[in-house]
Amino acid sequence: MEKKKSKFKRVLLILFILILLLLVFDVVSTEIKSKKLPHHFASAEEGRELLLSNTEYYSDFSQNDIDYRLKRNGGTLDELLDATTDEIKDFNFFEKYLLDHNIAKMVTKLNKNGYKLPELKEETVYIKTDMKVEGVNAGYTHGTQIYLNSANILVGSIPGKASEYFEHLMWHELFHCLTRNDPDFRAEMYSLINFTVADHDFEMPPSVSAKYFHNPDVEHHNSYATYNIDGKDTDCFLVWICTEDYSENDPPNGFVTDVALVPIDGSDVYYTMDQASNFDEVMGRNTDYVIDPEECMADNFSAAMQYGIDGEEGKGYPDPEIIQGVIDIVKR
């Protein structure tokens, strides 16, 4: 009996060691493969320093930008930055593994399909934040900094739609880093939805600048498309606006946003999406996220990288030529 117990214990020990070795191998191989898309995970301290380095972005904030994020009237930029940096946390080992696993999966798809992305001048830096100040968004970027909602990192470990959503997010945020890094890549991508990139940013007229709501993923307003408005072709750039000031009395209904189509000729007027009869024709119908060509193409890029030309579950796309265009660009 004692011999049987001893043998059983040895078998359990061997199984435990084998499982442990497999886990170690998986973690190490996943990390090695994921490094094909160069990145690192910021500590909370580094993440806070990086966020505070984005002075140009935050210095242009309006009072409305501050109030909506702090969810109260009369806040200051310093208070906003304090609240935003307080949300930045350290990654734990499991979260790093989950992210490396997703990045390794992205690398596999790039290699399998023969896709080549523009090289980044700096590696991407992933930063973990609770994201409450930024409206509980899933993610956003500055430069090559990718800020991820701490709750969504765990969602990425759930098989099925949840993990697919997280993969989409990872591709989407990476796109913003790529377009900042490579102006030619950005121009090519924007051209797929009929946008031309100019050599300068367009000035927002007073009627628009007063309502402009900052999006960290959109660094420039220097691209335009031709919209048919009241039967006339008008070259416009897009601006995300908040049509109402923040109100503590009615916060849920206070955040009303719209997309302003602003003529590039400098006239102090803007139009809405509904006023452009060809808005869907210009932007395509593959995504509803059309507040800016940057966000629209980030979604198209994500779909192309994640599902290819066949689309999710082989269902295709309303405008497959945009997806094919993305594939052609990264396959050259």
Residue ranges and their predicted role:
Residues 93-104, 160-165, 169, 288-296:
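Soluble non-cytosolic domains of exported or imported proteins
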